[in-house]
Design a protein with these regions (language model features):
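C-terminal motif of bacterial Sec signal peptides marking the signal peptidase cleavage site
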Residues: 16-21
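Exported/periplasmic ABC-transporter solute-binding proteins
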Residues: 4-6, 23-297
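Sec-dependent signal peptide hydrophobic core
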Residues: 5-13
């Protein structure tokens, strides 16, 4: 009887130890970057960046401190360069170990947006100021070169109807400048520039030409700097920029007008377990100081 009792007690102790061992996994430390250490991604980080001249890149490196003492862009030379929002999304969606950044309004389910410093990348958080990675959408033009049609289109963009489209498409609209009261217009407008602004402008174009069917609007996706140059040289009536214009660009005779606010979403592949990242970690990755996923913690 005593032997049987000892056997039962021994089994109970072993069972308790087994449960204790299993239970310890639930107490594994979670990294600052928001993922369990036992499931974190490992290996080389594939850094994906936009091209020089991209307004999204210019705003991103400025906001994240990826610049030197003279404000020069110091994105790591090992970064893979993409030349548009759509290519950035496709590249990140196809590379499990990649990280990139895109316009919040262009975000798709093909990639995962990370929280930055604990704040989710949403239009509401950009508007509230809790999501800090944000920038303006601007148009630019030479005021004295605008036709009546150009002026009418700009008035539509800034109207209640135009700003409703901005909000409906997931961007942050501005205070409208009244209702659109334009008359039937005819002619052609050429817009050129940011690949981040162009999806929004495409929606505005559709609504405007539905009211003004005799108007043709051509949208050229060429990047912010190229769009600003096109507006300066007269190759386009209106330039589109996802960054603020520089002093030298304004001194060339351009007028800049903000049409919306947009966040910049930091994105990874959907297979990446990471959910949260800090500004310092982003800076480390994009300057080349941090090269391994296991060091993002």
């Amino acid at each position: 009887m005593r032997k049987k009792f000892l056997a039962v007690m021994t089994a109970a102790v072993i069972t308790t130890m087994a449960f204790t061992g299993c239970g310890s996994s639930s107490n594994d430390k979670t990294t600052d970057a928001g993922t369990n250490a036992s499931t974190a991604l490992t290996g080389d980080i594939s850094v994906i960046s936009r091209e020089d001249g991209s307004g999204t890149r210019g705003a991103f490196v400025e906001l994240m401190g990826i610049v030197d003492d003279q404000d020069n862009d110091i994105t790591t030379q090992t970064a893979e360069i993409t030349n548009s929002t759509s290519v950035m999304l496709k590249t990140v969606s196809q590379n499990e170990k990649s990280i990139g950044y895109v316009s919040l309004g262009s975000l798709s389910t093909d990639v995962k947006a990370l929280k930055v410093d604990g704040a989710e990348a949403t239009a509401e958080n950009v508007k509230a100021g809790s999501y800090k990675v944000s920038r303006p959408f601007n148009i630019c033009y030479k005021e004295d070169k605008l036709s009546d049609l150009d002026k009418d289109f700009i008035s539509y963009v800034m109207s209640e109807e135009g700003q409703k489209i901005v909000n409906d498409e997931g961007y942050i609209g501005l205070t409208p400048e009244g209702k659109y009261t334009g008359s039937k217009q005819k002619g052609k407008i050429t817009l050129a520039g940011s690949t981040s602004v162009s999806p929004l402008m495409d929606k505005i174009k559709d609504a405007y030409t539905a009211i003004n069917p005799d108007v043709t609007i051509e949208i050229q996706e060429s990047g912010s700097s190229a769009g600003i140059q096109a507006a300066t040289e007269g190759a386009a009536q209106i330039g589109m920029s996802s960054r603020e214009l520089k002093d030298e660009e304004l001194s060339a005779g351009l007028t800049s007008k903000q049409i919306a606010m947009d966040g910049i979403a930091v994105v990874v592949n959907n297979a990446n377990p990471l959910t949260d990242i800090t500004s310092d970690q982003i800076k480390g990755i994009y300057t080349g100081e941090t090269t391994k996923w296991e060091d993002v913690k």
